[in-house]
């Protein structure tokens, strides 16, 4: 299963925010600069992350973005569930004439659930704690 770039950059943005001291604000511009992604694309991602409570956005002169809850409470599987379209195949009867008898969708759904269950074993904190090489790459001191 390949994650969409939307989910990929969502995870990267969260990783960046998790690498900052807890509660510290950053900006969308800073995140886009670190990862070299379009600002418009990142705005959409941050808006979605904010809607589901994973990011807090504060407007104004001293505003910015930060994690919506502690990194050790944000499971990677939950992030993927919020950002990723998880349907692997189009099983509508208009698209596939074997849909009424097909068992593949159930197998694929079980595989996706196993994938997500594995991701649930890890939090953002697991991705950043004691990860000096990551801090150096992100220019976080």
Curated annotation (Swiss-Prot):
**Keyword annotations from UniProtKB, A to Z:** 2Fe-2S, DNA-binding, Iron, Iron-sulfur, Metal-binding, Repressor, Transcription, Transcription regulation
Which positions are annotated as binding [2Fe-2S] cluster?
A: 91, 96, 102
> What's the cofactor?
[2Fe-2S] cluster
The segment(s) forming the HTH rrf2-type domain are 2-129
Q: Name one GO cellular component term.
A: cytosol
Q: Record's NCBIfam families?
A: PRK11014.1, rrf2_super
What is its biological role? Nitric oxide-sensitive repressor of genes involved in protecting the cell against nitrosative stress. May require iron for activity.
Name of the protein in question: HTH-type transcriptional repressor NsrR
Q: Which organism is it from?
A: Yersinia enterocolitica serotype O:8 / biotype 1B (strain NCTC 13174 / 8081)
Q: List the gene name.
A: nsrR
């Amino acid at each position: 299963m390949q994650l969409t770039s939307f989910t990929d950059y969502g995870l990267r943005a969260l990783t960046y925010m998790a690498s900052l001291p807890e509660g510290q604000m950053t900006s969308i511009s800073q995140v886009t600069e670190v990862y070299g992604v379009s600002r418009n694309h990142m705005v959409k991602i941050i808006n979605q992350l904010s809607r589901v409570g994973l990011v807090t956005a504060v407007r104004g002169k001293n505003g910015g973005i930060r994690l919506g809850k502690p990194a050790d409470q944000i499971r990677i599987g939950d992030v993927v569930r919020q950002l990723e379209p998880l349907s692997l195949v189009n099983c509508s009867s208009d698209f596939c004439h074997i849909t009424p008898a097909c068992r593949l969708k159930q197998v694929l759904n079980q595989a996706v659930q196993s994938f997500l269950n594995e991701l649930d074993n890890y939090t953002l904190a697991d991705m950043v704690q004691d990860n000096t090489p990551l801090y150096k790459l992100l220019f976080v001191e």
